[in-house]
């Protein structure tokens, strides 16, 4: 265990246990002879102080010994020693019962009787009921256990009384395959005994009929070996008698009636289901078996028959059997617990007493776990690993502490590795194939059980087995199990090894001479295989230590025997006792004692008279009073301390004052004693959420609590509050009621089931917002789609010549004839000619999209009458190429078509046939712009005029008349008409058109023969104004897109900033993340390429919550990953939280230590919010939300900055950072916020800090976040491109203005205070006050603070610090896990979209935004807001465009297509330039998902704006005028429940180092003018490792010094182990946990405090520090120098250059020489020298003086 802090009990009674005398070297022969002698005498052999050997057979196990006890040879002294160590040293013990041979009998039950504990009889009854499920007859053992490991875990108080007992299988479970499914086919083997008891004990005819059981040979599972009876050589073996005892035992543990019938039915069903396995089963037999099994198990036979394969049915048998065994164990533990509780209730000594020490809480317990490991391979691996592996467990601790550990030979090391490799899955080693194979099998079992479990009848016994808690799913193998490696790693291990004397089969052993069976070769083989001779030699010579103490603990334990303080005092006392020959060893940090020496000391202690008062070392507060203890242990402990909690041994200080609550004040309501037996090893967090049933007092049957609703309209709340509301809110409420007055409240109350007024009001607000959003969307859609048609009807029903040419496809065949456009797509393929010309594609294709006036000439005699009377008169074409295809010319009349076989022969063909037919294909007019008409007249000399918007062309007429010398036959039109064409060609002659007979008669001729089309009305202002408006918006949008594109271009080389030296807090809020995600995230922070000493991982676990898929609460997972010792139990300390009413009070536990990953060792702080005692029955005790986790850290740093009074939790955090980790919290300058499931790239932190260092105006910064599970599902794939482009377009653009509107909480960094004056930024009062708003009771606030806290925090920073910048840098990179399912994605985007809308409203209202009017960030924000709101309209419009294009119902939307192509084209350019080729595919997937992102998700989100958990503490029951009426159903929050105290006062009261004095305040008064807006500015509080920062106040020397040696306080190392494996038993003060980048300290350096800078006297020239970390000014490991690089800096200069011109060159030179005289020139850098000089001068040198400084440093170095 990581922290084996020893606490003694004064209730010990002596028992002598001397170390056995042994030869100088133990050989296999001497060991064999000794073991034989002990075997013959029936005695155990003690191999070393913690290991015993016994020899047992089934014969010796069934015979009574000299004491009349059965069960074989047992070492009762070993049990007694383990018990004494547990109760005297308050450390968990584990006794491992293992066997070297498979024939050895189990001694589990006999050993429990050997323990000096009162084991309740019900425990042995429970084992009687349990054994048949776990053991089977084999040829080599009549009762062979088929489990991996079975444990009995005793919880005992410090008096040694049993207060808890539970049985548990290990997580590896049972070998059902060997015990049931694959029994060997040879004789002598049976299945689990329980099945034979089932067949032998049918008690009633009704039971026999119901179960319908047959002979054992009828069942495939039992008939393989042909053995159905117990071994005949066992004198008392009878299945029927054993079955009766088995049933009686079941009843005794509460399995009776329906429960027992269900158990028996399940067993019978498994037997019958075995007949349905195998590939050779007949179909009829299979159906019959499934029918029977279905009836017994309450399962549809079709599920077994068709849904399960043969393999599935085998897996089902295995899974159901293990579930059944787990259930029996659960019932057994319940029975044991009930009997124990009854015993404790009737025992006055355990119910509490009034005397000192007589009152013991359930927390005052330690555990003794007896673990039975029947399989020799696993037992061997466990044993030899513990003895011979020097890199783990107690051996590693001893080695690190200076104990000489003899090296292990190569052969032994190979044996250990080989033994471990055989059972690596059982030992939790996940790297081998065995682990992966087991995981596959468990996954397969889970799959089959889920498939079957959901089909089982709801009220059936099997469903209760498989789904004990419906919401948790299948939990087989997860509930009620213990983890073997964790148990071994967190306890002191004792070994009890059983040896078998022969390989002979059991039936050959004689019952008359029990010890006659002895084969020296067989026993010798077992001794050699287990390396027991080497074991004895290794332990007895140097490593046989069974007790270890740290220095102070040892003195505190034995001070009454004359042991003096300090290392010298301890060594002297040991020498006085003669314990210098190996009986005791004083290591670097601990004292190690052999059993004989320890027991001698304990015996002497017992003989001493007891002191008048005995303190309970587990309690803290005013119960810790012991008048006889010395100054380091005899005074009351403060409430915030605990022996097992705080890692700094606060018992070593005289507490001069008590905690505030001792002087009166509000009563603490912290979680007190758990309501169940303390099982230990749970970090002091209790067992809530753990899947182990025996360890879970909060299971459903015990966790009922009243959660009724309070109806404020009919209920009786405690009191009513009235709070003022703003005018804006009043206007909004009035507006909402104006729009929703028609919806009666009673309808919402009874139909909508909204009983609360605030919920109804939120619904009304949501409805109004939805209506506004729909209105915006409707207006946009209407304006884009319909408004243009209203202004300009039929604009899509006209075509110009160019547009006509676009319709030239086979399925889009348009033509124009005499000014009209026709769609002849359905006509052109038809054979429409009655002449010999065939209609073919090649004939018709040339005419597609063309004007065909010349091919369809109207007969002049029909349409120009009375001017033309002869059919021979025709017009000649001015264009010689007018008729490219003469065959297509259509002339009607007998003159032009003399053939009578065609309809063209008829002169009326054009008007009677052609015009009616072509009219059916009419689409609209052919239009020409006025400019085109004019150009035809001026450039082409054509006679075009406009009359009443109609265009006529007389060019061919004039050409024909001129061709025939103006013969009247061809110049047939009146001259008054033709003169207008000649004189006004290209013009509009409407006003000149006369209403005369000539004009009227000419009109028909012009309309049919010379008509060209109409004037393009789409060029009119009414038709163009809408286009111009849309174009202007398009230009603006395109401009924004273009600017975003330009801002995203990063054409330069990737920057490689120099390593930075700022102190950074990595804030990690943890909620429900899984273990893999948490481990990956924490590992990534640890591996950051940043100075390990300058980063702190600050994890805040938001409540005791079990995430989906987890088997324990998130805090336990985090602490397990970080390697915290499960026995560490810090106190729960009060703090203020975000919440309503009493929820403003919360309690938290603080853990600290070092975490190692890939050679990086980083300090961490873990704060677990555990909640008030009244919350412990709730599902989420302590949970207050992510915002509260952020506020907790921000408020702490704010109080550190202002040196303001802190809460007890904050004081403990300060203490852990300042005194344990060794860094003044005020040194931290940045806060990196990272989600727990986010992995950060190694160089990201350095890049973020470098960017902030280069630009002091940056207050917040973020990098790129991508997906780490991009290919996990379709839902993750559609998010990849969105994540990428949202950063490289949106955030890159906003970063240009220094106004990133959302710094994502999953990966961003904030500056804590300004670089120049130290003005607080994110930790300022103004930001915290608004961000910590408790009254989140409106829809707007809910969306701001409950959904989008990260975005709103950025908004607040922008609001209060508009002059600062908020940047995005693409070089910093992190990856996070995106939602993998639709439901999770829907929930996430609901939060994101709604919070975006509400936050953008806030941002748009901010003052001091850069730019003005359309050239401002405000305009961009409004565009983003509108763009977010109208996302559905965008999607609808795109769908509309696709429909129009696909259906050919409108013109091709060229502009829209160009814009879309531009948008995605520019985006493509970005990732192509960045060589992110994969995003081509991701972009395509994203486009395919466009309707999801822009329609489904937004609409769902908008409608779900009021989907919150509203709580029932504070209910808004109405808003009247300028008041909000609130009903409060809560006891309220008493601020006195969180006492506040300044750190200096607290440190002084508790004699702690690190007091900082009033330097900051005195400096403020001295220099004045350094405070703005009540924000403390401290430009002198910077990292003293920064290159150019003023001297830190912590180097100036404060009052209250403790003299040369300072305080006697010696903060110990964090209990967290060096390796991040659970249960690693690192020493309490192990130097394994030092930083890897710091050399080992030697000698006296390893015995002193971490040394906070502020506690050192000015003149001190030498420093001592512990092996954990050097003091903060000595992290580089140079003990003898006097600078911050290698030791303590001199006090700051007495001169002050503020307000003057700064130091002159002489002062600079003098400072350089002084610094160079102090530092180690072999290791110091020029940068460090420059920092030291500036620190000494208390100023930052700039310009010429900076140049002089650099030059002078070089000069001084050259002259040295």
UniProtKB/Swiss-Prot annotation:
A GO CC term assigned to this protein in UniProt: plasma membrane
Keywords: Actin-binding, Cell membrane, Glycoprotein, Glycosyltransferase, Membrane, Motor protein, Myosin, Transferase, Transmembrane, Transmembrane helix
EC number per UniProt: 2.4.1.16
UniProt remark on domains: The N-terminal myosin motor-like domain (MMD) does not seem to have motor activity but is indispensable for polarized cell wall synthesis via binding to actin that ensures the proper localization to the hyphal tips and septation sites near actin structures.
Name of the protein in question: Chitin synthase csmB
Coiled coil: none
Gene Ontology molecular functions: actin binding; ATP binding; chitin synthase activity; cytoskeletal motor activity
Positions of region (Actin-binding): 374
Subcellular location: Cell membrane; Cell septum; Cell tip
Catalytic activity: [(1->4)-N-acetyl-beta-D-glucosaminyl](n) + UDP-N-acetyl-alpha-D-glucosamine = [(1->4)-N-acetyl-beta-D-glucosaminyl](n+1) + UDP + H(+)
Null mutant phenotype: Reduces drastically spore production.
Residue ranges, annotated region (Disordered): 1-23, 344-363
Chain's role: Polymerizes chitin, a structural polymer of the cell wall and septum, by transferring the sugar moiety of UDP-GlcNAc to the non-reducing end of the growing chitin polymer. Plays an important role in septal growth or maintenance. Mediates colony spore formation.
Membrane-spanning parts: 731-751, 767-787, 1029-1049, 1419-1439, 1452-1472, 1480-1500
Family: In the N-terminal section; belongs to the TRAFAC class myosin-kinesin ATPase superfamily. Myosin family.
Matches recorded under PROSITE patterns: DEK_C, MYOSIN_MOTOR
Membrane topology: Multi-pass membrane protein
InterPro entries the record matches: Chitin_synth, Cyt_B5-like_heme/steroid-bd, Cyt_B5-like_heme/steroid_sf, DEK_C, Kinesin_motor_dom_sf, Myosin_head_motor_dom-like, Nucleotide-diphossugar_trans, P-loop_NTPase
Positions bearing carbohydrate: 275, 878, 906, 995, 1394, 1584, 1652
Glycosyltransferase in keyword set: yes
GO annotation (BP), single: fungal-type cell wall organization
Extent of Low complexity compositional bias: 1-17
